């Protein structure tokens, strides 16, 4: 019985260690800019661009994760100090890619 429990624990750890990728599409505000994943705390609607939000207080992500407030990261491109965000990160199972 003990061997079965150890085998089950090993299988369970392999399943929970699944590799996840995150991906950002090109900007959806007709600029076609390449976007990167950010967690932004001050997103507001962009002036003159109904398909985007803008922010200054952002942290760029390099690992798949949720933001501190458990929200999905935004996909943004930069113009000067501003981040222009037009969509959200897409999380995918690495085996699907």
Curated annotation (Swiss-Prot):
Residues 1-17 form the signal peptide. Disulfide bonds join 24-75, 39-67, 40-58, 76-85. Its main location: secreted. Keywords: Cell wall, Disulfide bond, Secreted, Signal. It comes from the Eukaryota. It is found in: Secreted; Secreted, Cell wall. The keyword Signal applies. Aerial growth, conidiation, and dispersal of filamentous fungi in the environment rely upon a capability of their secreting small amphipathic proteins called hydrophobins (HPBs) with low sequence identity. Class I can self-assemble into an outermost layer of rodlet bundles on aerial cell surfaces, conferring cellular hydrophobicity that supports fungal growth, development and dispersal; whereas Class II form highly ordered films at water-air interfaces through intermolecular interactions but contribute nothing to the rodlet structure. This is Unclassified hydrophobin F.
């Amino acid at each position: 019985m003990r061997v079965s429990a150890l085998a089950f624990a090993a299988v369970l750890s392999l399943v929970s260690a699944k590799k996840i990728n995150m991906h950002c599409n090109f900007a959806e505000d007709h600029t076609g800019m390449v976007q990167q994943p950010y967690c932004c705390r001050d997103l507001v609607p962009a002036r003159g661009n109904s398909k985007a939000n803008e922010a200054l207080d952002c942290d760029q992500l390099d690992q798949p994760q949720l933001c501190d407030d458990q929200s999905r990261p935004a996909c943004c491109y930069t113009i000067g100090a501003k981040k222009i965000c037009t969509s959200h990160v897409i999380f995918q199972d690495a085996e699907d890619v």
